[in-house]
Amino acid sequence: MMKGGMAGLMKQAQQMQEKMQKMQEELANAEVTGQSGAGLVSVVMTGRHDVKRITLDDSLMQEDKEVLEDLIAAAVNDAVRKVEQNSQEKMAGMTAGMQLPPGFKMPF
């Protein structure tokens, strides 16, 4: 009985590891869009935190450099927050059925 239980646990652990690997790949390839200035600046970022694209509204071309820098920084920060939120939501959904002890932190 103990031997079968251990084999079952090992199989579950392997399946979980495979699911985690697939989830991490999906998260890394996911794209989010952060915005600032009511959409005047947008930043597209991957789950790896790679910035793919920055879009500036034409009306901003008349603004001074400092305003543009602030808006770009705010849009990047918004994208980073969205990447983190997306990761947390996906991982929470994956671990929802697991019997984990209170306060247990997954190693990812």
Curated annotation (Swiss-Prot):
Main location, first listed in the record: cytoplasm
Disulphide-bridged cysteine pairs: none
Gene Ontology terms for molecular function: DNA binding
GO cellular component: bacterial nucleoid; cytosol
Region of interest: Disordered: 1-25
Domain of life: Bacteria
Alphabetized InterPro entries for the sequence: YbaB-like_sf, YbaB/EbfC
Matches recorded under Pfam families: YbaB_DNA_bd
Localization, UniProt: Cytoplasm, Nucleoid
Keywords: Cytoplasm, DNA-binding
Record-annotated membrane-spanning stretches: none
Subunit structure, as described in the record: Homodimer.
Purpose of the protein: Binds to DNA and alters its conformation. May be involved in regulation of gene expression, nucleoid organization and DNA protection.
HAMAP family (alphabetical): DNA_YbaB_EbfC
Family named by the database record: Belongs to the YbaB/EbfC family.
Descriptive protein name: Nucleoid-associated protein Pmen_2646
Organism encoding this protein: Ectopseudomonas mendocina (strain ymp) (Pseudomonas mendocina)
Taxonomic placement: Bacteria, Pseudomonadati, Pseudomonadota, Gammaproteobacteria, Pseudomonadales
